């Protein structure tokens, strides 16, 4: 089994959902983001999502857009992100890593080369925010050959017929975008999630991770119980950004994010 399958199977036996924190690679710099990445599993991360900085992150709100710009300013490239994953794998070979980004950098890198290099670095899955199912052929064969999961995104506005189409070739887990709009804005109610999840369960047996609009421990607990995982992104980035001075990391940066992550993990595991 893949690391993603192994982790979700283990959590199912434990009777709880997963916590998936997000960090933007090289935000505010390579060393700080790597330090944070390495510390996240001990703070309660079950899987980790790494954002690949991009100059036009259309699905992201101002918080993650600002993080992407800081990452780019610090020299982030797709190759640099893979270097970070390789460094992480020197000390952790169990925690699943998922890259989240946009199609343009992958296309520029070369889809086949990217999938091979990502797998060699220790990446387990990829989420390509702006890649519709109709264009998935660009990556599908290369990803399968490299044993990489392509994580599919579905939303409240996804029709039933579209849902089955999108999830037909899905692997790893399903990322449910629980709100319409950009990241870090609104949040879905428990009632909304309870209404949405059965429809997704009918279309796939894969675990369902709920993201967009999950920011508090209570929301993370609810999402991880109704679904199979809660993804927390903007809330962690906001905390990190609040510790920066002139865009640079301070001694408060990593501890502040880890403290918040520990609180989220405690709620998910309660």
From Swiss-Prot:
It catalyses: (1S,2R)-1-C-(indol-3-yl)glycerol 3-phosphate + L-serine = D-glyceraldehyde 3-phosphate + L-tryptophan + H2O. It comes from the Bacteria. Pathway: Amino-acid biosynthesis; L-tryptophan biosynthesis; L-tryptophan from chorismate: step 5/5. The active site is at residues 49, 60. SUPFAM superfamilies: Ribulose-phoshate binding barrel (SSF51366). Pfam families: Trp_syntA. One of its GO terms (molecular function) is tryptophan synthase activity. Coiled coil: none annotated. GO terms for cellular component: cytosol. InterPro entries: Aldolase_TIM, RibuloseP-bd_barrel, Trp_synthase_suA. Keywords: Amino-acid biosynthesis, Aromatic amino acid biosynthesis, Lyase, Tryptophan biosynthesis. Its EC number is 4.2.1.20. The alpha subunit is responsible for the aldol cleavage of indoleglycerol phosphate to indole and glyceraldehyde 3-phosphate. Tetramer of two alpha and two beta chains. Belongs to the TrpA family. PANTHER family: TRYPTOPHAN SYNTHASE ALPHA CHAIN, CHLOROPLASTIC (PTHR43406:SF1), TRYPTOPHAN SYNTHASE, ALPHA CHAIN (PTHR43406). This is Tryptophan synthase alpha chain. It comes from Gluconobacter oxydans (strain 621H) (Gluconobacter suboxydans). The lineage of its organism: Bacteria, Pseudomonadati, Pseudomonadota, Alphaproteobacteria, Acetobacterales.
């Amino acid at each position: 089994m893949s690391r993603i399958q192994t982790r979700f199977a283990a959590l199912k036996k434990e009777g709880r959902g997963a916590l998936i924190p997000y960090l933007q690679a090289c935000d505010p710099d390579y060393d700080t983001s790597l330090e944070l990445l390495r510390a996240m599993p001990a703070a309660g991360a079950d899987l980790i999502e790494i954002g690949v900085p991009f100059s036009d992150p259309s699905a992201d709100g101002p918080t993650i857009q600002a993080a992407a710009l800081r990452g780019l300013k610090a020299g982030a490239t797709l190759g640099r992100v893979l270097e970070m994953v390789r460094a992480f794998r020197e000390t952790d070979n169990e925690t699943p890593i998922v890259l989240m980004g946009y199609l343009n950098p992958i296309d520029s890198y070369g889809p086949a080369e990217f999938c091979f290099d990502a797998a060699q670095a220790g990446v387990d899955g990829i989420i390509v925010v702006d890649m519709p199912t109709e264009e998935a052929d660009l990556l599908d064969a290369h990803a399968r050959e490299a044993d990489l999961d392509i994580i599919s995104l579905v939303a409240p506005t996804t029709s039933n017929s579209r849902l089955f189409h999108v999830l037909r070739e899905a692997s790893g887990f399903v990322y449910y975008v629980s709100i319409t709009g950009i990241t870090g804005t609104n949040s879905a109610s428990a009632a909304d999630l309870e209404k949405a999840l059965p429809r997704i369960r009918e279309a796939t047996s894969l675990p369902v991770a709920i993201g967009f609009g999950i920011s508090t421990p209570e929301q993370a607990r609810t999402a991880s119980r109704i679904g199979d995982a809660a993804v927390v992104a903007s809330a962690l980035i906001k905390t990190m950004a609040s510790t920066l001075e002139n865009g640079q990391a301070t001694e408060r940066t990593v501890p502040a994010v880890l403290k918040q992550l520990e609180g989220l993990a405690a709620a998910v595991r309660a």
